[in-house]
Amino acid sequence: SGVSAWLDGSAPPLPQFATVPGLEAQIRLHDTLAAQLRQWRQQRGALNMNTVSARPVFVDGQLTDLQPDPRNRAKDLIADLMIAANAATARFLTDKGFPSLRRFLQAPRRWDRIEALAADHGVTLPAEPDALALDQFLMAQRVANPAGFADLSLAVVKMLGSGEYMATPAGVEGQGHFGLAGNDYA
């Protein structure tokens, strides 16, 4: 994307930036803050995975192809800020005594399968679910086998299970999100 290339320093600012005074500086500030938030979450055990996404291609209104839609810095920026906004919303609602609808991902019930997958790669994970240990394994595999990392990520995502939504009464702490290493996610 044009924003991603600009953030990476490989392209000039988009012409649209000139229409809003201060927009470039604001996006740079958001990018810096998002990187700090991501680092903080990762230190707490947020999982850093890379699954393959597809982008539909239409010609004359007809779907003609699916193209890989790789991650980029702009997409990561948006995702990081969405996570922060959801966490802030959850904390605000709790602080003000309001109920909320929370998205949570409990610790994997099939942790033994994730342990076995790691063992297949020569890594021993703790006997109990540990997001930080899992993320360290994933990061090592990203470096050791970049070409196979998307497949490994997909396997782990499937073993983690799907997130769920839960109504959380006022004053009750959220159940937490294993993959994001946080309790506040509304």
Regions found by a protein language model. Give the residues of each.
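Conserved, carboxylate-rich catalytic/transport cores that coordinate ions
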Residues: S1-A186
